Amino acid sequence: MKRSLAFGVIAGVGLLGGAALLIVGQSAVSPDAIQSSVTRAPALIDSAWKLPVAATFNADLAWQSNGSRCGPASLANTFRSIGEEETTEAEVLEGTGKCWTGYCIIGLTPDELADVAQAKTGRKVSVLRNLSADEFREHMKRANDPGRRYIINFTRETIFGAGGGHFSPVGGYLEAEDMVFVLDVNERYKPWLVERERLFSAMDTVDSDGDKKRGLLLIE
């Protein structure tokens, strides 16, 4: 019994240690890159917060509790914007068996996050991947529809020059500027705007934890 307990403790420490290493590895984006790689012009950010969907977030995001829980944090913020009851990471994850250590050890795939979402809402949840650039543009145009919510899975490396995969809600689309408003749930980044084509390129990549491409979650 003692040996089994010891093995269990060692395994748990190993999992948490692995999670810590993963988080450190994904935090290699410099403060300068965080600021300069995307658009943060106050006037444009202010306009973006006034978009129909972004406005439902009330310019207030609950930041992810650690570097591995961007998916649950994105769901919690999105659910709050549409009036669902589960509006914290803990409530989103309760009963799902996911991230039970407090960390999502290797992160969640879009399919896994969709399963978590569907377990907590009566709304339809879809995973959209293998989109063409034109299809992505059409979805971004619909990202201002109050009846729809998008969560995007992308790699930071394409946009910021370093970093790993990440989830964040889409706050909307400034069509005249052809820019997407990303409600980044990581407090180091905070919400930002980026050219649609660059965001598509960051999404149109293969998830390192599987053999499928990243994509969008659509909740409607």
Please provide the spans of the model-predicted regions.
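Positively charged n-region of N-terminal signal peptides that target proteins for export
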Residues: 1-4
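Active-site-adjacent structural segments surrounding the nucleophilic cysteine of cysteine proteases
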Residues: 6-8, 14-106
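Conserved active-site-adjacent core of cysteine acyl-enzyme catalytic domains
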Residues: 25-37, 52-54, 94-219
